Amino acid sequence: MNRVDADSTDSTKRRGIGEIIMLSRFSCRALLTATSTLALALAAVDRISPAGHSGLRTFAASPADVALDRTAASVSDEPAAGSLTFEKDVRPILKTHCFLCHGEEPEKAGELDLRLVRRMVAGGDSGAALVPGEPDASLVWHRIDDDEMPPGPKKLSDQERTVISAWIRQGANTAREEPLDPDEVRFTEEERGHWAFRPVTRPELPAVPETGRHLAPIDRFVYDKLHERGLAFSAAADRRTWLRRVTFDLTGLPPTREEISDFLADGSADAKRRVVDRLLQSPQYGVRWARHWLDVAGYAESEGQVEKDRPRPHMWRYRDYVVDALNGDLPYDRFVVEQLAGDLLIDDPADPNDDRHARLIAATGFLRQARDITQTDDTLANRNQTVADTLDIVSSSILGLTVACAQCHDHRYDPILIEDYYRLRAVFEPVMPIRQWRKPSERLVDMTDDATRAARAAIEAEAVALQQEINDRRRAHCKTIQEREIEAAPEAVRDPLRQAIDTPPKERTPAQTTLLDRYPKVRTIDWIVGQLVEYDNAAHRRFQEEEKQVAAIRDRKPLDRVLMAVGESGSPVESHVFFRGDPESPGEPVGPGELSVLVSHRAPRSAIEGRLDYARHLTDGAHPLVARVIVNRVWLHHFGQGLVRTPGDFGLNGERPTHPELLDWLADDLVRHGWGLKRLHRQIVLSRTYGQASGLAPGDRVPAGRSASDDPASPTGDEVARAAWLDSRQRDPENRWLGRMTLRRLDAEAIRDAILAISDQLDVQLSGPSVAISEDQEGKAVIGSRRLRDGLFAGIDGAGREAARRSLYLSAQRSLRLELLQTFDLPEMVPNCQLRDASTVTPQALLLMNDGWVVNASEQMARRLWSGADAAEDRVGLAFELAFARPPTAEELDDSLAFWERQADMFRQFSDPDWREQLREQPGAASLRGLASLCQMLIASNRFLYLE
């Protein structure tokens, strides 16, 4: 075989990326380390027809784009004179970086207290730290500007420095008269009045021009922000693009050919609504959106210690609870209550025969997601860490707040007292008492119903009966073997041999022992049973095959319903504030309660005495965070960015919402209409905002003399909308104001599931134990179970058809992650994931070019095309339809056919003897392999990996 020359210009001219891909299959791996080859790979991944490129960005940004982004990210001009105050603008910076040494401790570094302007002016050991109006004369500014303070590598940002310098220059103003003692005011009015802590209020719908009267509420709010900035909506995405987008968004799968043709044939005004209704009714909706929730829940099927990452074999029951809840459109308020306190919704004792009881207990698996290594390393510190991680998961997923900072001291950024943290912890401590701890194995709940137990017992009896029959026949056969060996001895010793072998070993005489040593093949029946392979290998194999029937019978058993859940012991649990977060140093006792900053805006409607009270308090419709946070999460997964871009941090250190009125309107609307998430999805995906194009279509141009502001609300002004897209791209490069759709890369699971779908392999069955992932001999995570022989690795038993199940159903063990999923940013749950990365890195391209699983899927797809169409043009058309939900352009068709033929030609010339023999038997094999090359190139393209 010819070697692939990575640096040869002639080589790269002769061979496209597909040739390199397929050559690598035959040569084990092509040499792809040279920069030139890597550049070729990255460029060729998206080489299918620039003419068909609908605004799809390639891996590298253009210099103009980079310049635009830098301009947008640059620090704004100095604030207007007198506009800065200490409490609002400066104190948060100093609190984050300086208060630990200069304020919070009884002994302050340099005797300098930075918590009050008055004390900065008074100064410390080095004199006055602040001279209002004169930054150059202010010691605090000099230390910051010279990078002397704060100590360590983390310094103030340029923007923070600008704020402090401008504030001093403006006179070091305060918002109000300062208190005499800074300890009296642990948080300011500005911190307590942060937007996210204020109650949700339903805003009025913005006014729009007469031409925009058709706009839905979402679009009115978006239009209002666009109009303020002289921007407008972009053109609508074409129907195929919209269908692919919404199908992936709601189910995580590509649309089928039938779904595409049905939608294109439906010319009614309700065509899109019918599509959305169908997708929301699909069981695959629950699979897709469960993945998003499981990210924030920190879902994992192992305990988390690297060396002893013990599996959680029953955790999949919680995963199935989430899928079922979402498919059933369980109202979000109920969803939260069940996960926080489902066990308390049951009248004791729980009845295993009541499926509702089992479901409610399974829901509390939410509180069992945090790492817990106490099974093998049960220390107070590890117990405490599990509780802390659980609290972090609860607060970030439901409240959108990071409370962990308040374990040791008042929160660095948000108005959360250390006492607040331990009050919140006291809500959950009865199920996780660190001084009455139960290890993971001691917290399993068996909810197996009587019918299942009876069925299991009957099947076990059947298996035992068959096993006994096999054992009896095997012993009879071994008795025959024993007698054969005795008969092979001289007649004079046969009876003594029989007497010796029937005598228990400890009772044998020396003469009997000597006799048996002379005839080593004469053994007890038990010995021969164990060593039958040495006496009669054929019989040994026959009995092994019969025992497979026993295993098959046992495989019919319905599964025990064992749940990883929580429950309260009933014993009182006292909670304390830990000094500096140390569980060995408990301080003042505390009772369960809400964060004080939230209570300051509205008191709980009833006392919070435990988990159920707290869960009901969160979901009573008046909480300022719960509805906002879930609305933002749903928006995030439809647009690639939330209205708040820090979905797990709605606090002062997070970003403010780009569209606060829209966020509040949607949050209020969610509560008003019963917390139904499917209704929220409909509102979003049927909006004009969601339906915009992500880029200009081929041949689009901006008409001369037209601007985006001519008629920004008009649904028919396509030329104007195209101009609006350019306006939005140039003036809003981050798409904060939603003047176009954001291009989004598919996440890891959607990529794998889509490859399985288009190659006609996907198994869409729901529920059940996770498909095993194991470490092979090379240390790589693969689908299947390890097979051991005498304690040593003997291979991987594949998962069969289950290997093609959706990625949600693969084992989620922390230390074993499939290479494909990990390469495309499958998150680590430490302790959970608020926002996934969407990286673009070289290993992704190399994996899609060389991974054996991807190559096999490409071949499976080629076989599907081969049987699905006869003409080459139709096969290429079907490939594009499956991969991109659209037919190829004329140029793409020509390029693809030519590429396919070049690939087939190359395969016809391979000299490998086995391959030559296959070609003689199957003359079309080379063409099929060439088609597989084309399929792999489509899979590796940006158009497949991204949603437009």
Question: Where are the language model's segments positioned?
Answer:
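Short, well-ordered beta-strand segments
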Residues: 166-171, 774-775
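Primarily short, surface-exposed interaction patches in extracytoplasmic proteins
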Residues: 209-284, 299-352, 414-415, 458, ...
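Globin-like tetrapyrrole-binding proteins
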Residues: 934
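Active-site histidine-acidic residue metal-binding/catalytic motifs
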Residues: 59-63, 68, 149, 195, ...
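Solvent-exposed helix-loop boundary motif
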Residues: 43, 59-165, 174-224, 240, ...
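Short, low-complexity, charge-dense intrinsically disordered segments
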Residues: 3-19, 24-27
